[in-house]
């Protein structure tokens, strides 16, 4: 959308008079509400969760795939399990899941190498010194030094703990169902459960990447519906990180560009004046944006600047090519108002990346001049 396009609609319309309705004061009776005892939320049972879900092609349910992902942190017995197993997933006996995965050949008990690899660097140094070996080097070098010892009997006695490792079958299952560990690690940020995702994947035959993108777009879009553009911008930045973690680099880059685009638009939360096209409302809106530019207007936050710089470096693009790429991403985004044209936005972002202060100063002056011209025309 062009700069100030919204001004072309009914900019000479007058606001309808507002009728004031008298309100009669009613007596207020003060009552003290009873204080309810704090109740712990009821936990959902595992059976209720699995009724919502569908198993993988191999027959594993999402909570079993999650255990497959976390299995290398556990021993064959005497484990302590995290609280989320019961609170989030309704699993009362995580050890039973480990035992079943072992029986089915998804995991196996590790050998000495995995046992030593779980030791801290401090403990490794102590062992090396105990056997008269050099404690220098990186952790992997210290582990290899211990494993190269001819007599492993003493080492076996000092490191009796064993861990699980995934078999080839287990690695294949986890690779095919990567959505489970992904959603587990993002469970506080993405409103999609492993149970619901499993049903969409296996019943609706949808790719998880598509499901994830639809979920993130819906969550961010709710802010646009309420004209909270700053919150939408924050959601886009969060989605950039979430999509990067999912390996969806192109979709992530679009979210980063959209974040910067909204940063440069000058739009904030609760921009309801954009819905009222009366001259008075338009004047108030433009005056507020003029004050915004006259103050300390931050173009983009440091995190966005750093991410844009990294994106350009990783793509090994010249400034000219990166500018073209930015314009392509801006082209699909519609804004109700812009302080800068798309070309100016691209120039500003390149200036920010390279710590150029002259270009932003010039373009800020141009934007202020445009605002003043529009205000004079009202």
List each language-model region with its residue ranges.
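Basic helix-extension-helix modules of the SAP/HeH family
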Residues: 4-6, 34-187, 367-378
């Amino acid at each position: 959308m062009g700069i100030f396009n919204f001004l072309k609609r009914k900019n000479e319309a007058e606001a309808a008079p507002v009728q004031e309705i008298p309100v009669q004061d009613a007596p207020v009776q003060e009552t003290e509400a009873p204080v309810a005892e704090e109740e712990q939320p009821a936990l959902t049972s595992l059976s209720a969760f699995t009724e919502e879900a569908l198993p993988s092609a191999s027959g594993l349910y999402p909570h079993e795939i999650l255990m497959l992902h976390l299995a290398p942190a556990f021993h064959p017995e005497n484990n302590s399990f995290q609280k989320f197993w019961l609170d989030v997933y309704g699993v009362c006996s995580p050890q039973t899941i480990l035992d079943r995965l072992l029986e089915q050949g998804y995991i196996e008990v590790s050998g000495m190498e995995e046992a030593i690899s779980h030791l801290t660097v401090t403990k490794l140094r102590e062992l090396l010194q105990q056997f008269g070996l050099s404690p220098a080097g990186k952790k992997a070098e210290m582990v290899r030094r211990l494993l190269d010892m001819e007599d492993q009997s003493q080492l076996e006695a000092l490191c009796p703990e064993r861990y699980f490792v995934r078999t080839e079958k287990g690695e294949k299952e986890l690779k095919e169902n990567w959505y489970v560990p992904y959603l587990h690690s993002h469970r506080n940020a993405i409103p999609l459960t492993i149970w619901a995702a499993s049903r969409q994947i296996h019943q609706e035959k949808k790719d998880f990447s598509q499901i994830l993108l639809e979920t993130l777009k819906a969550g961010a879009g709710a802010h646009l519906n309420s004209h909270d553009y700053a919150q939408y911008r924050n959601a886009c930045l969060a989605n950039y990180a979430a999509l990067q973690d999912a390996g969806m680099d192109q979709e992530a880059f679009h979210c980063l560009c959209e974040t910067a685009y909204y940063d440069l638009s000058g739009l904030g939360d609760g921009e309801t004046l954009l819905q009222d096209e009366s001259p008075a409302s338009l004047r108030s809106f433009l005056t507020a944006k003029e004050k915004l530019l006259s103050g300390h207007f931050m173009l983009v936050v440091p995190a966005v600047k750093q991410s844009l710089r990294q994106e350009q470096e990783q793509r090994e693009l010249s400034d000219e090519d990166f500018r073209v790429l930015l314009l392509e991403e801006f082209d699909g985004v519609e804004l109700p108002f812009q302080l800068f044209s798309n070309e100016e936005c691209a120039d500003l972002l390149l200036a920010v990346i390279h710590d150029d202060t002259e270009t932003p100063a010039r373009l800020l002056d141009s934007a202020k001049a445009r605002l003043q011209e529009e205000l004079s025309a009202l």
